[in-house]
Structures are given as C-alpha cells and as structure tokens.
Regions:
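Flavin (primarily FAD) cofactor-binding/catalytic cores of flavoenzymes
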Residues: 1-38, 81-195, 199-390
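Flavin (FAD/FMN) cofactor-binding and adjacent substrate-gating region
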Residues: 42-75, 217-237
Length: 390
C-alpha cells in the first residue's frame, strides 16, 4: 500500500475540480487532484451533442487560458464554433490542462474519512492519500433523478436516465419514448433521429418549451462579483432568491435552443405535452405498450428518462462509505456551506451542484467554476503565508 501526503486533495477532475487545481497551482499550494479528467462529459454525454453555454464560460480563474484564447491559438473565433460542440469543448479542456500543467491521478476514491485532524482518502487500489484539506467536486452523476412514482410504473430494464443512455449505435429502426420536455429531452430526440430511430415520442407534464435562444448574459457579472462578496446570495430575502432562481429556471427550462428545431422537424417525432405515463407493460415480443394520460397508446422499444438531477450528498459513495457524512450539516440534502464552500467539517469543501442552495442556481452550471475555485483557495491562503496573494 502506498501512502501520499498533501495539503489539498481535490476529488473530481471535471470542470470544478480542474478550476480549483488551476487556482491552487497559481497560488503555490501543494495539491493532488484525482479522477479521470472530464469522465462524466466523455462517458455520460452523447457524441454529437452541443452545449448551451457560450465561449465565455471558461475554466481559468486568472482569465488567461480561456476558450477564446484556445480558439485564437487555432485561428478561430467564437463565431466559428458556436453552438459549442462537446468535441470542441473537450479539446479546449485538454488544452487548458496542458497550459496549466494539471495532471490528475486517474484513480477512484472509494471512501473518505477524518482521522486526527486530517483526512484519509482510500483508493479502490488500496492506496491512501492523507490530506489537510479536501475539496469534493462531485459533478452530476450520482444525483441523476428518477421519480419513485414514475419508476414504479416501468418494467425493470426498460428504461435508462439520459446520462446512462448515450451510445446510440443500436438506435436504428427502434422506437423511443423520452419522458421529459426540457433541453436534454429534445436534444436526445434529435440525436436518436439522426442515429436512425424509427420513431421518437416526447411526453412531458408541462407545455412544450419554446425554441428560443437562452439569455445568460446577466449571470456572469453576478457570479464573478461573488468573489468579492461571497455571501450576497444568502443575504437575499426568500422572495429575491426565488426570483433569481425562477429567472435562471425560465431561461434554462422554458426555452430550448433554436438549433434543435430543424433537426426535429420530422414525421418520426411526436410530442405529447401535458401528459404522463399511466401504465407501461412489456408484451410477449418485448415491446413496451405505454398508455398516456391523454388516452394515447404507443408502442416503443426503449424509454429514456430526461428527468434531471436532484442533490442528496448521502448518495455520494465516498461519503456514505466513510465516517464524515454524519458530521456534515445538511438541509434538504444539500451541505451547509460557509462563504468559502467549507462544510461544518473543518477543512472539507464541497462545490459544484451541491453548492446551489447556499450560493444560488448558478452553481449547477460551469460559469461558476472560476468563482468557487477562487473562494476555496482564498480560504486556504488565509491560513498560509506562502501563497502568491498573501
């Protein structure tokens, strides 16, 4: 068994973890980052996907190695690549890692414990990392949400969440039902059509969203200003918080990107707004016979659930396996965080989607990676005279 000691362990090599690593390196803080870089994005998102974010949602807290800088190095501009494809985005991240010399250890942590005023992270290979501080940047994977009442109606093995169903190589001539009517549901529908699906049905309880460009321009100034005033969101009244959350929700949920419209203009697509599944039965041929609340009966081969994500940190395996979970104060499944993303366990920080409750809905999006990195590392620098900014 090998043992490593570090001041800071970053668990997760997605957008939030990479940004923290970049800021830690900038400030000269000894750190170790573990995880396979952008694994969720590479393994749980489909090829051919486009992002809703623009090129200003980059990872660099120092605003040097931006997406625009990457494009400039290739003789391109944002206009050449927007909407930003998943492939282009991932090549930017590869470039960003090289520029920042971020080299994650591609290992998995299977449990995290506290011991004698430090943390002990155990890898699945039996190695141990001892750390004074830990940042959890868990991403979305463990928060995939399938409502219990929906799951109870579906035969076992007949459905997958969108983050699980990303390989469309066998989609040709198959019939699909997608449950959910937001961006991911419509984008999966377009990709399935392009993969040769015979039919794609979309069922959702609400009205279908409008094809319209989402306006995120108001978000970046709010998030960037949080570096100097990290508590501004939590100081708002509940109504003010709700207003911001609704505005964010309406941009992301009441609109779907117009570049999907022409891709979905097909007789093979049927959209069923204001509907839910009443029943679903697998017949002798293995086909799924589905009845909707509007009385429509459809027959499909596969059901894809675009039912979103719901935070509950108890679902993080590394916390569930260790001794820390009971020490972390939570509210509604979210960790209680201070102004620098520190939990009620001193030295343990959590960012990304679990930060939404205390920092606002922006932290479910990558435009907030720079802010969380700066605030977390600022806390560590306040405890050390060795940082560049000290």
């Amino acid at each position: 068994m090998r043992s490593t000691k570090t001041k800071l362990l970053i668990i997760g090599a997605g957008p939030f973890g990479l940004a923290v690593a970049a800021q830690a390196r900038y400030e000269g803080i000894h750190h170790v980052i573990v995880g396979k870089p952008m694994e969720f994005w590479r393994s749980n998102m489909p090829k051919g996907m486009f992002l809703r974010s623009a090129c200003d949602w980059h990872y660099d807290p120092q605003n040097v190695h931006t997406i625009e800088a990457y494009l400039e190095s290739r003789g391109q501009t944002p206009r050449d690549v927007e909407p930003l494809s998943l492939d282009c985005y991932l090549t930017y991240v590869d470039w960003f890692q090289k520029q920042k010399n971020i080299q994650p250890f591609p290992v998995y942590i299977d449990r995290l414990d506290s011991s004698d005023e430090h943390f002990v992270a155990s890898t699945i290979d039996g190695d141990v990392i001892n750390a004074d501080n830990v940042v959890l940047a868990p991403g979305f994977r463990h928060f995939a949400h399938i409502p219990d009442d929906l799951k109870a109606k579906l035969p076992s093995g007949s459905f997958q969440h969108t983050c699980e169903y990303v390989d469309f190589s066998d989609a040709a001539n198959k019939r699909y039902l997608i449950v959910g009517g937001r961006q991911s549901g419509f984008e999966w529908a377009a990709l399935l059509l392009e993969a040769g699906a015979a039919a794609v049905h979309l069922s959702h309880r609400h009205a279908s969203p409008a094809y319209a460009v989402a306006d995120w321009s108001w978000v970046k100034p709010l998030v960037d200003n949080m570096v100097d005033d990290p508590s501004w969101f939590r100081r708002l009244s509940q109504k003010e918080k709700d207003d911001i959350s609704y505005r964010m929700w309406s941009e992301g949920r009441l609109k779907i990107e117009p570049w999907l419209e022409s891709r979905l203009r097909s007789e093979r697509v049927k959209v069923w707004p204001h509907t839910e599944i009443v029943s679903c039965v697998a017949n002798e041929s293995g086909e799924l016979e589905v009845e909707l609340t509007n009385g429509e009966a459809i027959t499909v081969d596969r059901i894809v659930l675009a039912t979103g994500y719901k935070v509950d940190i108890a679902r993080l395996p590394i916390l569930a396996a260790g001794n820390l979970l009971k020490e972390i104060e939570t509210r509604n499944g979210f960790p209680a965080l201070d102004d620098h993303f520190e939990t009620t366990v001193p030295g343990l920080f959590i960012t990304s989607m679990p930060a939404v409750q205390d920092f606002g809905p922006f932290f479910g999006f990558t435009n907030s990676v720079r802010t969380s990195a700066q605030l977390i590392i600022a806390r560590l620098c306040s405890e050390s005279a060795r940082c560049r900014s000290s």
